[in-house]
Amino acid sequence: RFYTSSYEDLIIKNEIAEFRFAGNYTAYLPYSTNKEKPMAMAFQNTYEVKPLSEAPQELAFLPVTVDCKQAKVTLLESDLEAYPGMFVQPDGKQALKGVFAPYPKKTDFYPWRKQEYVTEAENYIARVKGNRTYPWRILAITEKDAEMPVNNLVYALASPNRIGDYSWVKPGKVGWDWWNDWNLKGVPFKAGINMDTYKYYIDFASRNGLEYVVLDEGWYDPKSGDMLIVIPELDLPELIRYGKSKGVELVLWTVFNVLDSQLDEACRK
């Protein structure tokens, strides 16, 4: 990682980060799904597997893995705060080049979900305090694939906990409504964003040892930008009670800036 020691705030014009490999190894790359604006997407995709020299020279997001035969190298970041996350772009040879989103100059909101997006960007990537550290760039080396999910370098290099007691945060497996778009077949009710559908999901999660069910977009009206008003088709307290009776907790999805603007009220409610 880099660090700077300055009494004045700084503007970071750009950063050069390149990862060059000794051979034309196979890369596992999750490419952006937005061809027009590749840095504006949901950071979720399947991995494309190609030799480095044949990999499309498009933006991919982290983590990226390169199979160096005797071991795999996974490129990661940690302690990423007030700085753009790194994308990588194959160079058509045997390297991956770091690419960084420019700093937003102007933003607007999508009217259908109150989600902020960039309309104009600056010609630099960050405005930062002069005395600070920058993200760790991690090369996690594993000899067996089973070692990847238990590698703790990201956690070990992160800043110490600043939120106090976090014992209420519990990991677990989830059932996700968007995975099949509420598209249930052969059920004695109309599938959709309603009580019957989510109770069906909760029953499935309970039978199969899933600790959580996610209520993704639609449990509040995204156009309103008000997560305190649940749609009339759902009785959220009753759904929470039903889930607890089955040993299943609920996770509520929301647009970040909606939660940020209503954080105190939402947590009290």
Predicted features and spans:
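N-terminal accessory beta-strand-rich subdomains and adjacent acidic, glycine-rich linkers
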Residues: R1-A156, N161
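An acidic-aromatic substrate-binding cleft motif
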Residues: K129-F204, N208, Y212
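Substrate-binding cleft of carbohydrate-active enzyme catalytic domains
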Residues: V174-K269
